[in-house]
UniProtKB/Swiss-Prot annotation:
The gene is ppsA. The keyword Magnesium applies. It comes from Pyrococcus furiosus (strain ATCC 43587 / DSM 3638 / JCM 8422 / Vc1). Belongs to the PEP-utilizing enzyme family. Pathway: Carbohydrate biosynthesis; gluconeogenesis. This is Phosphoenolpyruvate synthase.
Length: 817
């Protein structure tokens, strides 16, 4: 075949993704649309393919390049089995990958590093090198220079592999100077196709490693005086009539990576009125390395530009409007709102567009008629939006679980507050509305997991709404409309036809901090697993046990223990199988007495003034060991089927003796802690946080913060009482100090730390937890992707801050709290 190694932007369009990847194709498309894109060319995917298929590598080459690495592990095995004659680099790569267990992180790191080293160390074929040199020479001549500064970026090309899957995985090199340096950076881009996390992702998604290629974009470097990103639809409010611009000093990497908090400007389309300006404190900026003339460094704004520049508005009002209008032009070309990277070049003062991609998080825009209908619809009730989405139908008001049969498929369930006994009715409902509760209440948690719209804390739903009425529930905004609002229902149906509220992870980022998911019911295991979560940080026992329709102790006393064990085992296995080999942490029963009392056979349950502080969790489990024993028997059944990914998590622990006694009961039924299952505890009681070292010495593998309880116990706030809900704050300094202390001690002893409370689904809390060094965060199914993005961003910030600290030799930073 005739290979095409180089393609100029002018020769490309959006249809050339297979040849130059999404990034390269997009730059070509914009160039030909008259957008001011810095000129450049792409080293095509065919060049990479030619490189790996035509560069012959001998055993001696491998030994010379990899040195001591060839004497151990996979590389040694591959060498021993390889033929003596030189063979294509691709054969070596595929042999190494075929023998790599991607779940063995040490092996994965070592083997992918070996592949990258081979790619970077081998000479570029002369036929490719000469074309790159000639193209670079032509690019330099366009600017009347012998050598021009360029940026070299990777661009993924597999048509069935979204480029988003490579986000943060392949390399970008800025301020590259000279043809030889360009060739080196192209090879480094190619090598980044084989990072551990990119390889892991492809393996887990079932992609064929041999059919994934990489193009490298070589583009004239904008020597940015000011730069940033813009969204041609407001990503916060979903308002398509607004453009949001973020701006900071220097090169755009500081903004894109999250290393700096940029200025934020909101511009109204059409009128070009600047509606809002938030001037940030911009501490750092990225510039061309002044010492080497190559690459970039991060410097302090106060030292490089002057103290007054830290809080100075980056863009003039005229520039804000110029950037906004350019964004509108790009959106008009593509016909969809765009996420755009822009920069002002300090050499010529002109605005340039570096990259543009569609915003994928927007919902379809309502028509003017639909918007008017929503505006005119009568809001009859307001509360807290607890689970997003739209639900419309006939109201059914119930007050206890004995009435759940009244709720039919598609009804709107209205009640004071839901409980586990109502779950069968909740599954049938089109939406749920409650008088009481907050975003951490039972109704909120279960609705989010089921994907059912829910509004909580309305105070008067059961009074204002009558059985037989028709209403439309907006679980996103916390509103209940009178009657059926057709435009909202239409949007819901369109979303459903397109797959509904998508939680499936098309291309999850790989983060150092694991992002897990909370699961209440085995029925949603597949949906939860599809989020791409790294495991289950909380599998609740309550719904499985209470769904038997009878008080579990009465069930056991009637000689039905084996039936209970089977039902539990069936549910646990369903989740363990959906996530295997990812870990699944099962929390033993933690239902308060009021939930037991409402069940058939629960008439002997004690009346407690505050059940949340009463007979529940492990304290009840040890008082009624027959129930805990049944749970352990169920887990043993699942383990015996080969599921070695289960952990046991004890709730409401406050003393080491509770751990010791629970282990004794587990061993009685043949379940061996630390061997058959991982063993851990919930940190929900301040006492557990304070004596964490004693709990660790009793023998635990992991802990998980139950912040819903930890917060209410620390602050003396009933989380389901809407009168004090405004005081409920998981980020209260006292709560955070307890969490920080536990993480610090657990790190010292090698005990894994996680969180499974509602706070794990809060981006603000996730950022704090990453900085505190937590090992994993377990979120609700609908929040997994958001939390993973937040975690990835915060981890990048930490790495950049560490680099800056080393660069500036700063004093040790203040503690977060």
């Amino acid at each position: 075949m005739a290979y095409r190694f180089i393609k100029w932007f002018e020769e490309l369009s959006k249809n050339d993704v297979p040849l130059v990847g999404g990034k390269g194709a997009n730059l070509g498309e914009m160039t030909n649309a008259g957008i001011p894109v810095p000129p450049g060319f792409c080293v095509t995917a065919e060049a990479y393919k030619y490189f790996v298929e035509n560069v012959k590598v001998s055993k001696e080459d491998v030994k010379r390049i990899l040195g001591e690495k060839v004497n151990k592990g996979t590389i040694s095995e591959v060498l021993a089995q390889a033929p003596d004659e030189p063979r294509p680099l691709q054969d070596w790569i595929m042999d190494i990958i075929s023998k790599t267990d991607v779940d063995d992180s040490k092996m994965l790191q070592e083997n992918t590093e070996a592949i990258r080293t081979l790619i970077k160390s081998l000479d570029m074929p002369s036929e490719i090198a000469e074309e790159i040199k000639q193209a670079y020479k032509e690019l330099s001549q366009r600017f009347g220079q012998e050598e021009v500064y360029v940026a070299v970026r990777s661009s993924a090309t597999a048509e069935d592999l979204p480029e988003a899957s490579f986000a943060g995985q392949q390399e970008t090199y800025l301020d590259v100077l000279g043809a030889d340096d360009v060739i080196d950076k192209v090879k480094r881009c190619w090598a980044s196709l084989w990072t551990a996390r990119a390889t892991f992702y492809r393996a887990k998604q079932g992609f064929d490693h041999s059919k994934v290629y990489l193009s490298a974009v070589v583009q004239k470097m904008v020597n940015s005086e000011k730069s940033g990103v813009m969204f041609t639809a407001n990503p916060v409010t979903n308002n398509r009539n607004e453009i949001m611009i973020n701006a900071s000093w220097g090169l755009g990497e500081a903004v894109v990576s999250g290393a700096v908090t940029p200025d934020e400007y909101i511009v109204e389309k059409g009128t070009w009125k600047i509606k809002e300006k938030v001037i940030a404190k911009k501490e750092v900026m990225v510039i061309r390395n002044p010492e080497t003339g190559r690459g970039t460094v991060m410097v302090k704004v106060a030292e490089y530009l002057g103290p007054e520049w830290v809080e100075k508005q980056v863009l003039t009002d005229e520039q804000i409007i110029e950037v906004a209008k350019m964004g509108q032009k790009i959106e008009d070309h593509y016909g969809w709102p765009q996420d755009i990277e822009w920069a002002y070049d300090k050499d010529d003062g002109k605005l340039y567009i570096v990259q543009s991609r569609p915003i994928t998080t927007l919902k379809e825009e309502a028509t003017a008629e639909e918007a008017e209908e929503v505006e005119e619809a009568e809001v009859i009730l307001k509360g807290l939006g607890a689970s997003p989405g739209i639900g419309a139908g006939r109201v059914v008001v119930i007050f206890d679980a004995s009435e759940i049969d009244k709720v039919k498929e598609g009804d709107i369930l209205v009640t004071t507050m839901t409980n586990p006994d109502m779950v069968p009715a909740m599954k049938r409902a089109a939406a749920i509305v409650t008088d009481e509760g907050g975003r951490t209440s039972h109704a909120a948690i279960v609705s989010r997991e089921l994907g059912i719209p829910c509004v909580v804390g309305t105070k008067e739903a059961t009074k204002k709404l009558k059985t037989g009425m028709y209403v439309t529930v907006d679980g996103t905004r916390g509103l209940v409309y009178k009657g059926i609002v057709k435009s909202l229902v239409k949007k819901k149906e369109e979303a459903k036809a397109e797959g509904g509220q998508v939680v499936v992870a098309g291309a999850p980022l790989v983060t150092g901090t694991m992002v897990k998911v909370n699961v209440s019911m085995p029925e949603v295991a597949e949906r939860a697993a599809a989020t791409g979560a790294d495991g289950v940080g909380l599998l609740r026992a309550e719904h499985m046990i209470l769904s038997i329709g009878q008080h579990p102790i009465k069930f056991i006393k009637e000689g039905k223990e084996e039936e209970l064990v089977e039902k539990l085992a069936e549910g646990i296995e369903k989740v363990a199988a959906a996530f295997y080999p990812r870990p699944v942490w099962y929390r033993t029963l933690d239902a308060p007495t009021n939930e037991f009392r409402e069940m058939p056979g629960g008439e002997d349950e004690p009346e407690e003034r505050n059940p949340m502080l009463g007979w529940r969790g492990i304290r009840r489990g040890l008082d009624q060991p027959e129930l805990l024993r049944a749970e352990f028997k169920a887990i043993k059944k699942v383990v015996e089927k080969g599921y070695n990914n289960i952990g046991v998590m004890l709730p409401l622990v406050s003393h080491p003796e509770q751990i010791r006694e629970a282990k004794r009961i587990a061993r009685e039924v043949g379940l061996e802690p630390h061997k058959d299952v991982a063993w851990g505890v919930m940190i929900e009681v301040p006492a557990a946080a304070i004596i964490i070292e004693d709990l660790i010495k009793e023998g635990i593998d992991f802990v998980s913060f139950g912040t819903n309880d930890l917060t209410q116990y620390t602050l003396a706030i009933d989380r389901d009482n809407e009168r004090v809900a405004k005081l409920y704050d998981e980020t209260h300094p006292a709560v955070l100090k307890l969490i920080k202390h536990v993480i610090k001690v657990c790190k010292r002893y090698g005990v894994e730390t996680s969180i499974c409370g509602q706070a794990g689904s809060d981006p603000k809390m996730a950022r704090i937890l990453v900085r505190l060094g937590i090992d994993s965060i377990s979120a609700n199914p609908d929040a997994v992707q958001l939390i993973r993005q937040v975690v990835a961003q915060e981890e990048r910030k930490l790495m950049l801050e560490a680099a800056r600290k080393q660069l500036f030799e700063e004093e040790e930073e203040e503690e977060l709290f």
